[in-house]
Structures are given as C-alpha cells and as structure tokens.
Amino acid sequence: MKIDSRILPELQESFSQFPGFQLDNLEFSRGLLSNPPLEASKYVKITHRMISNAVGEMLVKIYEPIGRNRDKLPAMLWIHGGGYVMGHPIMDDVLCERFVQAANCVVVSVDYRLSPEHPYPAAIEDCYACLVWMKNEAEMLGIDVNRVAIAGASGGGGLTAALALMARDKGGPSIIFQMPLYPMLDNRNTTPSSYEITENHATWNRTNNITAWNMYLGEK
C-alpha cells in the first residue's frame, strides 16, 4: 500500500530522505539511531553510570534538573526504542531532557542488551535490573520510590508493558504509572496494518517487524 499520501505535507521531505531500516544490515541501521543531539540542554544535568546486570555491567544515563535541591523528585525509567534490535540511550537525550523539564523529575535511561546477539529474555532482564537499581539507589538519586514511572517507545514500549508485568509477578518495585508509546507487542503479524505497510522505504514495514521479532525471540 502506498503510504506517502498519508504523511503530513510538512514531513514529506524528511520521509523521502530516510532510507528505511535494513535489518539485513544491522550495522547500518543501528548507525541511524546512534547520533548524539546537536546541543544539550543547559537546564539538565546528564550523568553516566555503569550498573550490574546478569552478565556484568550496563550503561545507564541519569537526567536531572540542574541546581535541584535535595527534595526527593519523582522518577521515570525510560526504555529506548529500536525494535529490540537497535537503539541506544543517546538517541533520546532531547526527549529525556524534555521529560525532566516538563515534570521536574529524574529520568534514568537504560542501555539494555539488543537482539540478535542477546535474544529474549536479556532485554527485559536488564530493564528489571535497572528498575531494582533505581529503588536500591533512591537515596543517591534523590527520588521518591513511591513515584517511579516506566515508559518507552516502539520496542521500548513493548519492554515497558513487559516490565510492569514482571515487576508485579516478582513482587518487585512498585510502579505508579506506565507509558508504552506505540509499543511493539504482537509477534503474530496478522493485523491489517501489518499487511498494509510493506514499502521498503517505510520507517518500519512488515518485513522489518517479522525479522525483528524473530531476532528477539530466537528459539523461544
């Protein structure tokens, strides 16, 4: 199905220049999502930390208001998108900075393991480990453990929904709110839109979705 006619006119030029993700060339596609923002916010402090996961360590990025007092702030665990196979916290720096400024909160973004190198359940285990770390390090982070939200987009949205269930089932840290944005939830690829969006230059087409799910689920 031709999707160009359904794109807002002001976005047409950007869309026409985007090559589309090519999951048979992951190095290329991952490169599309690894560019740092042009300018960091002067109102938000960003800190890099390494925390433990099941296989060693992983990166988290902490975003907080510059000049904050020591009052405990609400917090959000942000899970970047990328179809479970791409992405890095750096791609959402601007978005996380906006969350901090809009909600006067602390945002923690986790660099979870990606498929196919690390298929399910690696990514969700990393997200859960980060959530537990936030609870355990609440004093250092200056956050209120009773006001911790989780959120993510695309594959990160799917992990957000999964994390809410995992935390519930494990009796883990309490979550006050979840925000899965256009989440990647259904591996069956039977919906009408799955058959409609097939063009190679589409941002995320049927072939990409099937390929990414196969990479993520592995032998599961």
Task: Give the role of each language-model region.
Residues 150-152, 181:
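Short beta-strand immediately N-terminal to the catalytic nucleophile in serine-hydrolase-like folds
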Residues 165, 169-220:
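Hydrolase active-site cap/lid region
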Residues 72-82:
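Short beta-strand element of the alpha/beta-hydrolase
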Residues 118-140:
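Alpha/beta-hydrolase active-site loop
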Residues 152, 156, 160:
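Gly/Ala-rich beta-loop-alpha elbow adjacent to hydrolase catalytic centers
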Residues 1-65:
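A glycine/proline-hinged amphipathic helix-loop "lid/cap" segment
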Residues 135-150, 170:
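Gly/Ser-rich "nucleophile elbow"/oxyanion-hole loop immediately N-terminal to the catalytic nucleophile
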Residues 90-110:
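Short amphipathic alpha-helix adjacent to the substrate-entry channel of hydrolases
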